[in-house]
Amino acid sequence: MEGHKAEEEVLDVLRLNVGGCIYTARRESLCRFKDSMLASMFSGRFPLKTDESGACVIDRDGRLFKYLLDYLHGEVQIPTDEQTRIALQEEADYFGIPYPYSLSDHLANEMETYSLRSNIELKKALTDFCDSYGLVCNKPTVWVLHYLNTSGASCESRIIGVYATKTDGTDAIEKQLGGRIHSKGIFKREAGNNVQYIWSYYSVAELKKMMDAFDAWEGKGVSYWRVPHELIECWTLEERPLLGSLRHMAPIRKRRLITFNEADESVNYKTGPKPVRFLGPSTSTQIKVKNSASVTVSPASAIQTSAGATANRFQSGSRRKAAQRSAPSRATALVGTGAPGHPQASPGAASAENGGTHLPPAKVLLSDKKPTPQRVIKLKRTPLCATAPCLPSPTATRQANSLKPLPGEAARALGVRTENGKNKGN
């Protein structure tokens, strides 16, 4: 059994001698097209001519047969030489093989085969194919507006214009006719995409009798006109394909409407400055100040600091005058204050006794610099009886009343005043 199967496989693989060129092919590939000559030759119904080696002899061009054999195996090779392509077509016709003349022919054959097998309309298959490449499946055409005027023996024929779309051509017709386009003497007829306007004194029935093939107009020109005597005008808008080869024409890309959000989010292929976006009261421009990221100032602290600075400036003038009058007593007060056994006045109390108001400092957080300790100079003010009373400013009085020292601080301040009074008496 195994030997019988091997013999059948050997018989299915055939050796061919085509014009002195030796090829090997399967019988199934040679019979791919059922109605071809090769399918009839290798179907087994007819005896085959063989040479001394047992190869089947085919008296044709072996060089061209290679293209056909590759095509039967599913590979398409189109020669670049025009003469070779013509000779290959003759060889394919001889064997009954539908070998494509060009790539477009090959694609058309594949499209037709696919449509028949899948039961899909060919137009839809072509449209899907063009959509996959983003192309428009349409042949470029133009719209030609032709004018014909016959009056007796005279005849005028000219082209008014060539337009890209039918709408532009229709607008040109309306401009030419003006108000006559809606009159009873205007007759309009259409054939396919083409349109024609006829103006005359004849009725439609009379025009059908006078004009050759009036009802059989296919929208192709106005060459059939045979109208005697009376004046007749005709405007014909006809769609015509562009002349010349389309080989050098760039493919027409489909237009795609892009919304604002899509265009904003998509990749910008054009290099250049981007537009400034409005983000409220100011634009997106950012102005940075050195160490501004770590500084936090509360509004209340800023107001208290400004008020305290005003009060300190007012009180400093009074202290300067009092210091000039009582320099000896100030030295004694400094010695008595630093004596052991007597409590030291706190910085807050000392500043309050000097006539200034102690305000809570503004909340300043500097991450780059370490906080430095404040240097406090302790000065004792002379007794109130020795100096002239000075009236504090309303701002200083208001802030002094708003600050309530702790009971311990108040006791220490009173103790300092009592001790200073004793020293003064001594």
Swiss-Prot record:
CDD domains: BTB_POZ_KCTD18
Top-level taxon: Eukaryota
GO MF assignments: identical protein binding
Residue stretches of biased makeup (Polar residues): 305-317
InterPro entries: KCTD18_C (IPR045704), SKP1/BTB/POZ_sf (IPR011333), T1-type_BTB (IPR003131)
SUPFAM superfamilies reported for this sequence: POZ domain
Region spans: Disordered: 305-371, 389-408
Domain BTB span(s) in chain numbering: 12-80
GO BP terms in the entry: protein homooligomerization
Protein name, UniProt field: BTB/POZ domain-containing protein KCTD18
Top-level taxonomy: Eukaryota, Metazoa, Chordata, Craniata, Vertebrata
